[in-house]
Amino acid sequence: MATILPPPGTALFRHFTRQSLATIERLKEETLIAPKAGAHEEEEPPTPNPDLEAGKSLPMIFGDPPSELLGTPLEDIDPFYKAQKTFVVVTKGNTIYRFNAEPACYILSPFSLVRRGAIKILIHSLFSTLIMITILSNCVFMTMSNPPAWSKTVEYVFTGIYTFEATVKVLSRGFCVGPFTFLRDPWNWLDFMVISMAYITEFVDLGNVSALRTFRVLRALKTITVIPGLKTIVAALIQSVKKMVDVMILTVFALAVFALVGLQLFMGNLRHKCIRWPIANETASELFNGTVFNDTLSYNDTTWLNDTLDSNSTFDFTEYIENAENQYFLEGSKDALLCGNSTDAGKCPEGYLCMKAGRNPNYGYTSFDSFGWAFLALFRLMTQDNWESLFQLTLRAAGQTYMLFFVVVIFLGSFYLINLILAVVAMAYDEQNQASQQEAKEKEEEFQRLLEQLKNQEQAQVLGSRASLTSKKSVSLTGSDVADDEQSLENNEALKDCNGRPIPRLIIRAPTMKESAADYELREKEESSVHSVLHLDEPGLRERSASVATAAASVATAAASVATAAAMEELEEAQRPCPPIWYRFADIFLKWNCCEKWVVFKKWVHFVVMDPFVDLAITICIVLNTLFMAMEHYPMTEEFDYMLSVGNLVFTGIFAAEMFFKLIAMDPYYYFQVGWNIFDSIIVTLSLVELGLANVQGLSVLRSFRLLRVFKLAKSWPTLNMLIKIIGNSVGALGNLTLVLAIIVFIFAVVGMQLFGKSYKDCVCKISSDCELPRWHMNDFFHSFLIVFRILCGEWIETMWDCMEVAGAGMCLVVFMMVMVIGNLVVLNLFLALLLSSFSGDNLSVGDDDGELNNLQIAIGRITRGGNWLKAFLIGTVQRVLGREPQKPAEEDPADEGEGKTEGMEMNHLDGFKLADGIANCLVGGQPSGVTLDGESSITVPIALGESDSENPSEDDDDQEDDVDSEVTCEENEHHSDGVEDEFGVLQHVKLMGALTDGDSSVCSTVDYQPPEPEVQEEEEEEPDLVEPEACFTDNCVKRWPCLNVDISQGKGKKWWNLRKTCFTIVEHDWFETFIIFMILLSSGALAFEDIYIERRRTVKIVLEFADKVFTFIFVIEMLLKWVAYGFKTYFTNAWCWLDFFIVDISLISLSANLMGFSDLGPIKSLRTLRALRPLRALSRFEGMRVVVNALIGAIPSIFNVLLVCLIFWLIFSIMGVNLFAGKFYRCINTTTAELFPISVVNNKSDCVALQEATQEARWVNVKVNYDNVAKGYLSLLQIATFKGWMDIMYPAVDSREVEEQPSYEINLYMYIYFVIFIIFGSFFTLNLFIGVIIDNFNQQKKKLGDKDIFMTEEQKKYYEAMKKLGSKKPQKPIPRPANLIQGLVFDFISQQFFDIFIMVLICLNMVTMMVETDDQSPAKEDFLFKVNVAFIVVFTGECTLKLFALRHYFFTNGWNIFDFIVVILSIAGTMLSDIIEKYFVSPTLFRVIRLARIGRILRLIKGARGIRTLLFALMMSLPALFNIGLLLFLIMFIFSIFGMSNFAYVKKEAGINDMFNFETFGSSIICLFQITTSAGWDTLLLPMLNKEPPDCDPAFENPGTDVKGNCGNPMMGMVFFCSYIIISFLVVVNMYIAIILENFNVAQEESGDVLCEEDFEMFNETWEKFDTGGTQFIEYSQLSDFCDALQEPLRVAKPNRQRLIEMDLPLVIGDRIHCVDVLLAVTQEVLGDTIEMVAMRESIEAKFNLNNPTSASYAPITTTVRQKEEDMAAVVIQRAYRNHLHKRGIHHAAYIQRSKTGRKAASEDAPEKEGLLAKKMGALYGSDADLADEVEGLRRRPDPQTRCSGARCSPEPPEPNIILVPVEITNELLLHSAPSQQSSPTQTILRETNV
């Protein structure tokens, strides 16, 4: 954070003069000299203050600069620039501009008049406005597809204005030299480019002008430079694009691999068509009478045919098969029907044969014939655009088995990679968000300090002027009496006390009607002042400084100091947006307190209007009004229509009356301060306007505004409120992003129109049979915009084919891919990221702090209480009549206490008037009723359960104790009148008393009621197995029927008990459970055989019927056994047992029906399908599945909540759709061609009916999915929201005219806007909410189960994770190097990293050669590729052979080697036997693709690939969870496919149902359901189900092979089936998949952000293996230094490292060896730093390692490195000390001998050394033996070999002057008692150091 702002005030602003320039130059010189002087004291470099950046507003603290200084050059106010040549200019709006003080363009100095004029123009607000208007006008002109002649002149004007702008900028700033000049701002490059292009295209002829004109569209980007805030969003986008690089690389790589697989599997397949056969031509048919053509023609054998036919020139076979007339086309299809020659591929109809002919489907663009097209097809699959079409084409041509390929691509490619992009964008957004929050927080802290300073200065004055705030009479800061809770703090911000706890808003005052008008008025005014203190939300204030607002808000909400609040109020008054006169006007005209009677009347109105019952009534009216609007349909009777219109009038009246009375009760001034009231007033006004304009044509859309009343429900429905808030917040936050998106859409729409518009016009016949422009084209701006919008929705491929056909493939691909990647993958994902960030755990459990919600609860509470009283009264009356004594409440069973009874609860925070009814009876005669003042007893206040805010009346002790603290703040309420104060004291006492006893209620307030924190529960343990059976029946049953109480100790009872024990033993046995699971799986599998062919397979049918009886019998036996074993009580309290019971019942019923002959009854058939639920029970036994199911069940409430909210949200669009389109989708069609009659022939229904009677060829039909009523509207909206079948709804909508009129092509074009708006709000928002809800739910459930790391700090978690990773690994024993010389050399060669990389490069080259392959390639190319492939096989075989030779049998210990070996064997076999393998299996080239997996190995070697490794790691982490979800999904598909088979097997084959994709067999059902799991094509499967009567279907249709008649569908069943499947699979299960990926990506990201990761430990192990060749897990201490140096960062300890290694204190075992775990722990600690808490962690990791590695038994340390070093040092110190001691003794003795020789010895002096070694030797040296002395002297003069310290041994240093040298021979004997030397003691040393 930059330094604190300079001292505030205007004295800081000084004119920029020549003197200022001189000062800057002087300072600059000083700064240049200063570094040389004090280089060593350099602090961190200063940074510019972010608050004073150019373009920012001047911070408030500076005040307003004097007017004469505005717009003139001033000295720079940022201290950072004091020594730089810059100056600033501040505009009238206090915006800062910074300029370079060097002469602009070397000519204009800062003091030049021209430059000053240019600056004045540049900073003027009108200048930017002019530029903005110019850009927008220019954009409007660019949207013209056929510009008028004069537009050229306008173009010149625009260019002129842009040139003028650039000139002004250059003159004021300079061109490019120095900071803050024109070209130093990257945004100005854009301007420069645009202007340059304008002049270049004008003066230089560059050919294709329209392509160059598209450059003009970049001018739209200039809006980004002009609108503040857009630059930051663009920066965020660029940031996320940078972060996406890794994902993009991974995606491209994965797509390339899949494309290669696709290329090998499906090359040429999509050209197999059905050709008419036999040939009608006689000459040809003679040729083909051979037997070959009685079978199907094999794929590519047409060549010999052509050779055969060459001789016969009259018939050209190629031309015959290429001719479209000889190919089989389905009705309405542009492409011929595909077919295949494998058994499960599509078959040709009679008279046709499957051959390869013609081009590929979709203009030839959909194919796998070359790598490029295969890649495009895979990209399409990954983005899931119209992929069902590709899926169906491929399966039809290649066979249904290949569904597996699509499953893999959809799950890995689509779900995983696309959502990784979302995860990355979300993370980038999140990081930026956190950074900005951090910045704001720092700013606020800084501002707080400044504010403190200000406050101290002004305190005395403030306290004097605002004393009224603290007066006794004043209202407390805790609430407001005037309005209902709507008047409370906006955004429901609770007030807080000094501890940050919420202050209750409760004001207990007996509601009295006697309060005088004056008091009322005074109180109201005081409240308003407090209200305004707490509402610093004025826009003016916000504009000046966001941080002030936040600081002010935090000061106000702290509510610790009234003085601060007063200061802030003054501050606010200064910043009020309106002049004071308006406030005076408001006081006079908008606060209605004219006379006392009026005030009393007003209070009565307030009392009534604000009553909870009125709220309840209004809510009921809203619901009824919504129902009335939803009842509109087509066709309606007149009576019904009249009823609806009357209803509308009534509701409009009710809502108008509510608004009117609220205005009276609250005064307009306060009424319009509440958001909901403004919302109400707008709707009421619009409703009234609509009544007036009811008959005006075209204004019926006003009726739609009434629908917004539905949103009023949000006041009383937290989830809807949350949704609206989230959308509100997002739209607010998205304001800038939406603008960016709009600019992107605009630019691409214009680019498309400019580049391709002409081509669409000229080449239209290529894509349209009638040569009219199709609906999707780019010839004008609106249609071009629609295409771009459609691409944003994810549908790009179909429009791109059209574009490629008319305008060429290259350009279209570039433009469409850019829109797709930039618009869809980046910007839309940023939308979603923003939406997800709006979610937090609190959002879904929205607190009840919304006033209106309490009102509803109170009203419902009263009703409940009334109902309970009535019930009790009636029961009492009946009992008295019957002569019984009514039960006293006191005697009630404690268990039932609180159910519907009044109970002591926390009192609601009700304002004065709300107390009128609900709590009035608490306060009777100045004492709270229900409060006993007996000191002993606990005290409660009666309140109806429903009236409480809290959902959970009894809290835990802890919570209550906490509450005591927070709620003591109630004493702030002593601002009330004295009478209430007394009561209040009691109430406080009450509260404290209540807190002592569990379950008693707090009386003070529940405004701060938080639901108790979810307890950290341990995951439910499996209940311990019961040893014997429990009781059969519950205690109540036994009480009621005593005969059930059996004595089990004797007689029959004992036998019964033994029987139960036996059954229990059987049931509890593992084998029993396994057997039952096996039976369940078998019975489920049996269901899959009951398809439409069952009647033809009599044997199978008989077997299945018999098996069904057996299964039923087994399950009944199982159920009975369990009843006997467990008893009814246990059995029927288990949900899985209930499921079992339900399924067994179904089986029994259907079996009984079969035996009685009722098997053909519809209900019985439906019941049979419910047997498909059987697998659920088996899967309840699988742990993984159960986890997913539990998670799902946990999420169901939230999912339903959101589903309900979505339905309400969609209801508005559905009703609007009914208003706009009901009855308008009907059309008159030609029954033979299914084409529409033009309006010139048929104008309306009556014309059509007449034509039908005349010719029988016309029919008046409706579109199947329409808006004729709200339910159908919902279906339409679901199709639009999933983007499936939405075209079939949009086209009739834009063609519609009026009810019962024939539609006309695009006559109602702007109806597209309805769909665009719905897609944005109904699809982008609400569907993505599901992801938000599910992710949020997962996180909440995690919290509930308790993260295992709750009790660890962040640092410890990192440590823990690191430890976890390294504990699970151990170094492997490396493969020993062979003793043989040649083998050894080869071993060294293949162990090199270079060898690995070389092989990887070869693999990649091999892939490249595969990519070059195409369908129908020339023989020469084929031959060349074959040879290259053989060469590669030889190389890889060579690699394999070398490894086998060098590694011997160890080769097979590595998984990768085995993998390589198998691939090589398969490749060789594939080359040799390619024809046989291809005929019976898949193409052998696939084996080469498998080799790509090896590239995964190289990722570890590349440092830059860490990001990609993270992504793959995230995938690996997700796999187990994804497998569980996959299982669940399969289960759902299984159940639905069985259900589909029994209900939709015989529907008419049309739309999406055909011979291959249908519900006739289990296989084809599963294929259809897999397809619609991604919501693809579900609309086409639904359409045939909607046929219910002729002529759409034929009820008498004969289905061959069965006795089932008819091919009509069941519309209701179809809609329920498909909608429920879409919601369950597409919205819930698939989103769980996404949630897991996002979660794991975040985890992986955190892990990769850790200092140490998995790879570092692997690298450690690999390095260790090189040093510990025996795999002993120990190395020599002497090797440690080299080992630590050989490690890679971050674990490396570089040389010289001896000292650091010793300090690590590593344990040594016998033989000075060190264990790997010790070294690893030590280097890890070096990286992470040392903390005390890690001791326990180390112990646990060592224990874990010992567990994993039994080899470490010998791991018993005897010393450590530090200890060893200490011992060495100790030895040296002892030796030195002993030597010094000997020197001293020697010197004493030598001096004595010398004195003896010279005769100076005193007579009484004795020899110091009388006996011992020293005396003996010195006697020998100095006593008598002179020769010996000379010899020693000679020895002394020899040079000494040892000079310096080495290790722990220190050698003698050279002698110093003035030292007497006494030669002493010290032998081993002499050193006997010294410390042991480190290595070996020298036998002879000469002692030289003698200090005298």
From Swiss-Prot:
III repeat ranges per the UniProt record: 1052-1366
Annotated stretches, region: Disordered: 34-54, 884-905, 945-982, 1836-1856
Under the heading PROSITE patterns, the entry gives: IQ (PS50096)
In this entry, the parts of the chain located on the Cytoplasmic side of the membrane are 1-125, 173-186, 228-246, 424-612, 663-676, 717-732, 832-1071, 1122-1135, 1182-1198, 1332-1394, 1443-1454, 1503-1521, 1638-1892
| Described purpose of this protein according to its UniProt entry | Pore-forming subunit of a voltage-gated sodium (Nav) channel that directly mediates the depolarizing phase of action potentials in excitable membranes. Navs, also called VGSCs (voltage-gated sodium channels) or VDSCs (voltage-dependent sodium channels), operate by switching between closed and open conformations depending on the voltage difference across the membrane. In the open conformation they allow Na(+) ions to selectively pass through the pore, along their electrochemical gradient.
Q: Which PANTHER family match?
A: SODIUM CHANNEL PROTEIN TYPE 4 SUBUNIT ALPHA, VOLTAGE-GATED CATION CHANNEL CALCIUM AND SODIUM
Q: How does it assemble?
A: Voltage-gated sodium (Nav) channels consist of an ion-conducting alpha subunit which is functional on its own associated with regulatory beta subunits.
What is the protein named? Answer: Sodium channel protein type 4 subunit alpha A
Gene encoding this chain?
scn4aa
